Amino acid sequence: MLSMQACAVSNSKKVFPMSHQAMSDAVLDQLFRQARTVHAFKPEAVSDATIHQLYDLLKWGPTAFNGQPGRYVFVKSAEAKAKLIPALSPGNVPQVESAAVTVIVAYDTRFPEHLPTQFPGYDAKAVFDANPAIVEPAAFRNSSLQGAYLILAARALGLDSGAMSGFNPQAVNDAFFPDGRFKVNFLLNIGVADPAGVYPRAPRLAFEEAAQIL
Protein backbone atom coordinates (compact mmCIF):
# COMPACT_ATOMS: atom_id res chain seq x y z
CA MET A 1 0.00 0.00 0.00
CA LEU A 2 3.03 2.26 0.20
CA SER A 3 4.44 4.03 -2.82
CA MET A 4 7.66 2.59 -4.18
CA GLN A 5 9.55 5.69 -3.03
CA ALA A 6 8.14 5.41 0.47
CA CYS A 7 8.95 1.72 0.61
CA ALA A 8 12.52 2.41 -0.40
CA VAL A 9 12.90 4.99 2.36
CA SER A 10 11.35 2.83 5.05
CA ASN A 11 13.05 -0.41 4.00
CA SER A 12 16.50 1.20 4.02
CA LYS A 13 16.32 1.49 7.80
CA LYS A 14 14.49 -1.73 8.63
CA VAL A 15 15.97 -4.15 11.10
CA PHE A 16 14.20 -7.42 11.84
CA PRO A 17 15.26 -8.47 15.34
CA MET A 18 13.76 -11.94 15.14
CA SER A 19 13.45 -14.82 12.74
CA HIS A 20 10.03 -15.94 11.56
CA GLN A 21 8.58 -19.43 11.46
CA ALA A 22 5.21 -20.85 10.57
CA MET A 23 2.68 -20.89 13.38
CA SER A 24 1.33 -24.17 14.67
CA ASP A 25 -1.93 -25.61 13.38
CA ALA A 26 -3.47 -24.91 16.78
CA VAL A 27 -2.72 -21.20 16.44
CA LEU A 28 -3.94 -21.10 12.83
CA ASP A 29 -7.14 -22.84 13.91
CA GLN A 30 -7.72 -20.29 16.68
CA LEU A 31 -7.06 -17.30 14.44
CA PHE A 32 -8.70 -18.50 11.23
CA ARG A 33 -9.99 -22.01 10.56
CA GLN A 34 -12.02 -22.61 13.72
CA ALA A 35 -12.78 -18.99 14.62
CA ARG A 36 -16.36 -17.91 14.12
CA THR A 37 -18.47 -14.78 13.91
CA VAL A 38 -20.52 -14.69 17.11
CA HIS A 39 -24.08 -13.37 17.48
CA ALA A 40 -24.64 -14.00 21.20
CA PHE A 41 -22.31 -13.88 24.17
CA LYS A 42 -22.07 -15.31 27.67
CA PRO A 43 -22.40 -12.82 30.56
CA GLU A 44 -18.65 -12.68 31.10
CA ALA A 45 -16.87 -9.34 31.41
CA VAL A 46 -13.87 -8.14 29.43
CA SER A 47 -11.59 -6.18 31.73
CA ASP A 48 -10.19 -2.75 30.97
CA ALA A 49 -6.73 -4.31 31.12
CA THR A 50 -7.71 -6.73 28.36
CA ILE A 51 -9.08 -3.85 26.28
CA HIS A 52 -5.67 -2.18 26.58
CA GLN A 53 -4.05 -5.45 25.49
CA LEU A 54 -6.28 -5.56 22.43
CA TYR A 55 -5.20 -2.10 21.36
CA ASP A 56 -1.55 -2.80 22.12
CA LEU A 57 -1.71 -5.72 19.67
CA LEU A 58 -3.77 -4.20 16.86
CA LYS A 59 -1.66 -1.03 16.68
CA TRP A 60 1.26 -3.01 15.24
CA GLY A 61 -0.65 -4.11 12.14
CA PRO A 62 0.67 -2.64 8.86
CA THR A 63 -0.97 0.39 7.28
CA ALA A 64 -0.05 2.82 4.50
CA PHE A 65 2.74 5.16 5.61
CA ASN A 66 2.40 3.62 9.09
CA GLY A 67 -0.65 5.86 9.50
CA GLN A 68 -3.03 5.25 12.38
CA PRO A 69 -6.43 6.55 11.25
CA GLY A 70 -8.36 4.04 13.36
CA ARG A 71 -10.16 5.35 16.42
CA TYR A 72 -11.90 3.02 18.89
CA VAL A 73 -14.70 3.65 21.34
CA PHE A 74 -15.10 0.64 23.63
CA VAL A 75 -18.78 0.76 24.56
CA LYS A 76 -18.96 -1.18 27.80
CA SER A 77 -21.24 0.50 30.35
CA ALA A 78 -25.02 0.26 30.35
CA GLU A 79 -25.19 4.02 29.82
CA ALA A 80 -22.93 3.91 26.77
CA LYS A 81 -24.85 0.99 25.28
CA ALA A 82 -28.12 2.85 25.78
CA LYS A 83 -26.60 5.68 23.77
CA LEU A 84 -25.61 3.31 20.94
CA ILE A 85 -28.68 1.08 20.73
CA PRO A 86 -31.04 3.61 19.07
CA ALA A 87 -28.67 3.70 16.07
CA LEU A 88 -28.80 -0.08 15.54
CA SER A 89 -30.92 -2.15 13.22
CA PRO A 90 -33.45 -3.95 15.45
CA GLY A 91 -31.95 -7.36 14.77
CA ASN A 92 -28.57 -6.25 16.07
CA VAL A 93 -29.77 -4.97 19.43
CA PRO A 94 -29.56 -8.35 21.24
CA GLN A 95 -25.98 -8.81 20.05
CA VAL A 96 -24.88 -5.51 21.55
CA GLU A 97 -26.84 -6.16 24.74
CA SER A 98 -25.13 -9.51 25.29
CA ALA A 99 -21.59 -8.53 24.26
CA ALA A 100 -19.14 -7.62 26.99
CA VAL A 101 -18.04 -4.67 24.87
CA THR A 102 -19.04 -3.22 21.52
CA VAL A 103 -16.27 -1.36 19.73
CA ILE A 104 -17.10 1.57 17.50
CA VAL A 105 -14.32 1.25 14.94
CA ALA A 106 -14.02 4.74 13.50
CA TYR A 107 -11.48 6.79 11.58
CA ASP A 108 -9.86 10.17 12.04
CA THR A 109 -10.38 12.47 9.05
CA ARG A 110 -7.29 14.41 10.16
CA PHE A 111 -4.99 11.43 10.64
CA PRO A 112 -2.26 12.87 8.33
CA GLU A 113 -1.43 15.37 11.09
CA HIS A 114 0.33 12.53 12.92
CA LEU A 115 2.36 11.25 9.96
CA PRO A 116 5.51 13.31 10.61
CA THR A 117 5.90 11.38 13.86
CA GLN A 118 4.67 8.01 12.60
CA PHE A 119 6.57 7.99 9.30
CA PRO A 120 9.53 10.34 9.79
CA GLY A 121 11.61 9.02 6.90
CA TYR A 122 9.29 10.48 4.26
CA ASP A 123 7.02 13.51 4.08
CA ALA A 124 3.80 11.53 3.75
CA LYS A 125 1.74 14.36 5.22
CA ALA A 126 2.60 16.47 2.18
CA VAL A 127 1.06 13.82 -0.08
CA PHE A 128 -2.28 14.23 1.66
CA ASP A 129 -1.98 17.99 2.03
CA ALA A 130 -1.60 18.23 -1.74
CA ASN A 131 -4.45 15.80 -2.40
CA PRO A 132 -7.17 16.35 0.22
CA ALA A 133 -9.64 14.20 -1.72
CA ILE A 134 -7.61 11.07 -0.91
CA VAL A 135 -7.60 11.60 2.86
CA GLU A 136 -10.97 10.09 3.70
CA PRO A 137 -10.68 7.05 1.38
CA ALA A 138 -7.26 6.34 2.89
CA ALA A 139 -8.64 6.75 6.40
CA PHE A 140 -11.53 4.39 5.68
CA ARG A 141 -9.34 1.80 3.95
CA ASN A 142 -6.67 1.69 6.62
CA SER A 143 -9.09 1.82 9.56
CA SER A 144 -10.77 -1.20 7.97
CA LEU A 145 -7.43 -2.98 8.10
CA GLN A 146 -6.98 -1.93 11.70
CA GLY A 147 -10.45 -3.19 12.56
CA ALA A 148 -9.51 -6.56 11.09
CA TYR A 149 -6.38 -6.58 13.23
CA LEU A 150 -8.63 -5.99 16.23
CA ILE A 151 -10.61 -9.11 15.33
CA LEU A 152 -7.39 -11.13 15.18
CA ALA A 153 -6.17 -9.59 18.44
CA ALA A 154 -9.39 -10.65 20.15
CA ARG A 155 -9.03 -14.19 18.83
CA ALA A 156 -5.39 -14.29 19.90
CA LEU A 157 -6.43 -13.38 23.46
CA GLY A 158 -9.07 -16.11 23.55
CA LEU A 159 -12.07 -13.86 22.92
CA ASP A 160 -14.80 -14.06 20.31
CA SER A 161 -16.22 -11.31 18.16
CA GLY A 162 -18.85 -10.38 15.63
CA ALA A 163 -18.59 -7.45 13.24
CA MET A 164 -21.74 -5.51 12.34
CA SER A 165 -22.72 -3.03 9.66
CA GLY A 166 -26.43 -2.94 10.51
CA PHE A 167 -26.61 0.55 12.01
CA ASN A 168 -27.29 4.15 11.06
CA PRO A 169 -23.84 5.75 10.57
CA GLN A 170 -25.11 9.30 10.92
CA ALA A 171 -26.85 8.43 14.19
CA VAL A 172 -23.65 6.88 15.56
CA ASN A 173 -21.60 9.88 14.48
CA ASP A 174 -24.09 12.32 15.98
CA ALA A 175 -24.14 10.44 19.29
CA PHE A 176 -20.41 9.79 19.70
CA PHE A 177 -18.53 12.12 17.33
CA PRO A 178 -20.60 15.32 17.15
CA ASP A 179 -17.69 17.54 16.07
CA GLY A 180 -17.37 15.60 12.80
CA ARG A 181 -13.67 14.80 12.99
CA PHE A 182 -14.15 11.06 13.60
CA LYS A 183 -16.53 8.91 11.56
CA VAL A 184 -17.75 5.38 12.22
CA ASN A 185 -16.55 2.57 9.96
CA PHE A 186 -18.14 -0.52 11.55
CA LEU A 187 -19.11 -1.99 14.92
CA LEU A 188 -17.48 -5.01 16.55
CA ASN A 189 -18.94 -6.98 19.44
CA ILE A 190 -16.40 -8.74 21.66
CA GLY A 191 -16.84 -11.23 24.47
CA VAL A 192 -17.06 -14.95 25.19
CA ALA A 193 -19.28 -16.81 22.76
CA ASP A 194 -22.57 -18.35 23.77
CA PRO A 195 -22.75 -21.52 21.64
CA ALA A 196 -26.38 -20.69 20.88
CA GLY A 197 -25.16 -17.65 18.99
CA VAL A 198 -22.79 -19.52 16.69
CA TYR A 199 -24.33 -20.48 13.37
CA PRO A 200 -23.28 -23.54 11.35
CA ARG A 201 -20.12 -22.94 9.34
CA ALA A 202 -20.95 -21.54 5.92
CA PRO A 203 -18.85 -22.49 2.89
CA ARG A 204 -16.07 -20.37 1.44
CA LEU A 205 -15.07 -19.95 -2.18
CA ALA A 206 -12.44 -22.36 -3.48
CA PHE A 207 -9.08 -20.95 -4.51
CA GLU A 208 -9.98 -21.39 -8.17
CA GLU A 209 -13.11 -19.28 -7.72
CA ALA A 210 -11.47 -16.38 -5.91
CA ALA A 211 -7.80 -16.28 -6.84
CA GLN A 212 -5.30 -16.74 -9.61
CA ILE A 213 -1.56 -17.04 -9.89
CA LEU A 214 -0.04 -15.10 -12.78
Stretch-by-stretch model annotation:
Residues 2, 7-214:
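Acidic, surface-exposed loops and disordered segments
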